[in-house]
């Protein structure tokens, strides 16, 4: 997997895009408005500057990270070559179902569809698609570039191949993945 799409440039989305881009992935960051995208890129830039100030990143690495991110206001323009799409929109079930239906229609057949939901059933979200075996939860903790934990949530139909790919991807990002079944609140929000 090389080409990542992140839907939503807010707090979680820009952190997810930052993390993938800093790890060397090409990221298409999508939001409904250019203003939201500009705010997201500004936040990523500020966070990268903080990492530089601590001596943990160079200006060249910052430029590479920002160069790995392309912004889009139309989902249809961003998904053509996606290997993984991570949805990080507002925690609203109807909105997520609508987005997943669009993702399913626009993404290549082999693309994995992930959600950053903290509480909505992965099985329910997968029902909006024709590829429930490729739908999975990938719940990052805030602030994403710093927090190591990521919950990998299997829906009823999520395949072992999809789970294994996202579990390993999380390790590549420097995260500590934990396997979670599709229960209300998953792990972090149940505690």
Located regions from the model:
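NAD(P)+-binding Rossmann beta1-loop-alpha1 motif at the extreme N-terminus of oxidoreductases
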Residues: 1-50, 54
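Acidic/polar active-site rim loop that often engages polyanionic ligands
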Residues: 25, 80, 143-152
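Hydrophobic/aromatic beta-strand patches that form the interior of the parallel beta-sheet core
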Residues: 28, 70-72, 86, 136, ...
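Rossmann-like NAD(P)-binding element
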Residues: 35-39, 50-52, 56-113, 119-120
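A non-catalytic, amphipathic alpha-helix used as a structural packing/dimerization or gating element
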Residues: 35-46, 95, 161-172
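Rossmann-fold dehydrogenase core element
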Residues: 109-115, 126-141, 173-176
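Internal alpha-helical scaffold of NAD(P)-dependent oxidoreductase catalytic cores
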Residues: 131, 152-183
């Amino acid at each position: 997997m090389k080409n990542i799409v992140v839907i939503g440039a807010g707090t979680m989305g820009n952190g997810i895009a930052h993390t993938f881009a800093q790890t060397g992935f090409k990221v298409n960051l999508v939001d409904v408005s250019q203003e939201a995208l500009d705010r997201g890129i500004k936040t990523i830039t500020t966070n990268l500057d903080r990492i530089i100030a601590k001596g943990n990143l160079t200006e060249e690495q910052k430029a590479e990270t920002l160069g790995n991110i392309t912004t889009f206001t139309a989902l249809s323009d961003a998904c053509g070559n996606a290997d993984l799409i991570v949805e990080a929109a507002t925690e609203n079930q109807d909105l997520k179902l609508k987005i997943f239906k669009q993702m399913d229609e626009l993404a290549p057949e082999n693309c994995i569809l992930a959600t950053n939901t903290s509480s909505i059933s992965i099985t329910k979200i997968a029902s909006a698609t024709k590829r429930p075996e490729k739908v999975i939860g990938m719940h990052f903790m805030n602030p994403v570039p710093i927090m190591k934990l990521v919950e990998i949530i299997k829906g009823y139909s999520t395949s072992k191949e999809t789970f294994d790919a996202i579990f390993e991807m999380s390790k590549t990002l420097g995260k500590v993945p934990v396997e979670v079944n599709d229960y209300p609140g998953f792990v972090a929000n149940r505690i």
